[in-house]
Amino acid sequence: MAKKLKKNEEITKKFGDERRKALDDALKNIEKDFGKGAVMRLGERAEQKVQVMSSGSLALDIALGAGGYPKGRIIEIYGPESSGKTTVALHAVAQAQKEGGIAAFIDAEHALDPAYAAALGVNIDELLLSQPDSGEQGLEIAGKLIDSGAVDLVVVDSVAALVPRAEIDGDIGDSHVGLQARMMSQAMRKLSASINKTKTIAIFINQLREKVGVMFGNPETTPGGRALKFYASVRLDVRGTTQIKGTGDQKDSSIGKETKIKVVKNKVAPPFKVAEVEIMYGEGISRTGELVKIASDLDIIQKAGAWFSYNGEKIGQGSENAKRYLAEHPELFDEIDRKVRVKFGLLEESEEESAMAVASEETDDLALDLDNGIEIED
C-alpha cells in the first residue's frame, strides 16, 4: 500500500513540474507577443501603493482617501450649473503642471476663460487646448494624447457637450436616440486600457439632467449613458451651498461660495466622504482657508476666542487674518500642511522632505496671486 502511495506521489510531482514548465513557457510567449507585464502574479504588485496626484485641494485629497486622484484611472466630476466643476478640474491642471507634468484640456463647451485659469495657477502657455467640432473628434484627440504616453492629465469639459457628428450634420428636431450613449460607450472601451497603461488621469466633467416621470427616488442623472459611470474609478458630486459675504466695503457683496464635494464612487478608498471648500471668485479654492479650518479641527492650529495661534505664536485674529498670515509665510503653510497630511495618513514621515519643494512652490504662487489682487467675474 505504501509503495503504491509513493508511486502516485511521484506521478503527481512529475505532473506538477510539467505544469509549471508549461505555464512558464506560456508566460514567456505572452510576454514576447504582448510585452512585459501583460500577465503577472498579483503578489508581485500587492505591496505597491496606488499612485496619486494631488487634486490641488487639501480637503478633497483627504476625502479621496488616497491623497489625490489615482493615476491611470477615469474620474467623473458632475453637478448643477455654476457649482464649481470646472474650477475643481482646473486646480488639478495647475497641480499637474506644478509637479512637472503636461496637461491637456478638451473644451467641448468652447467656454474656457484663460484669465480665470491663469488666476487659479494654470500655466496657460503650456496648457494643451482643443476645441473640437464634434464629440467623435474630441474623444479621438483625447485618445491620441493618451496613447502618446507623454500627457499626465486630460480634462474633457464636458460630456454633455460632446455632440455626435450625425446630430451636428442633421436638422434641429431630428431624433437621434442613444447616439451619444453609444459614442461614449465605445470611447470608454477604447480609452480605458490605454489610460491605465500610460498612467494618465482622465477627468470627464459632466452636467445634470432630470428623468421625466420619476415619482420616487432621485430624478437626477448625467447624460452620456451608463458607460462613464461604470468605467470611472472616482465620481465627484460638486454642489455650491451658501454665498460667502465680504468684509468692510464688500460686506454686502458676495465674494465666493461654500461648496461641498461628495465622493459618490471610489474604487481606491472608502467612498461617500465629503470635502467642504470655499471657492472664492477670481481665486478658486481657498487653500489657506481649508488649511486653517482642518488644522484647527485637529488642534494643530489652536483657537482661543477669535485668535488663532500655532506653536504658541499668534498668527491672526479672525480666520481672514490667519489666512492672510499663512499666505505671507509659505514655509509655515508648508509645515502645517505636512502635519495635516501625516495625521490623515496621506503622507509618511519619510515623504515629508520630497513634498516640501512642491508645497513651497504652490504657496509662493498663492502669495503672488494675493499680492496681485486679481479679480475675475464668475
Curated annotation (Swiss-Prot):
One of its GO terms (molecular function) is ATP-dependent DNA damage sensor activity. GO terms for cellular component: cytosol. Can catalyze the hydrolysis of ATP in the presence of single-stranded DNA, the ATP-dependent uptake of single-stranded DNA by duplex DNA, and the ATP-dependent hybridization of homologous single-stranded DNAs. It interacts with LexA causing its activation and leading to its autocatalytic cleavage. Belongs to the RecA family. SUPFAM superfamilies: P-loop containing nucleoside triphosphate hydrolases, RecA protein, C-terminal domain. The keyword DNA repair applies. Keywords: ATP-binding, Cytoplasm, DNA damage, DNA recombination, DNA repair, DNA-binding, Nucleotide-binding, SOS response. ATP binds at residues 79-86. It is found in: Cytoplasm. Pfam families: RecA (PF00154), RecA_C (PF21096). This is Protein RecA. The gene is recA. It comes from Streptococcus pyogenes serotype M5 (strain Manfredo). InterPro entries: AAA+_ATPase, DNA_recomb/repair_RecA, DNA_recomb/repair_RecA_CS, P-loop_NTPase, RecA-like_C, RecA-like_N, RecA_ATP-bd, RecA_C_sf. One of its GO terms (biological process) is SOS response. HAMAP family: RecA.
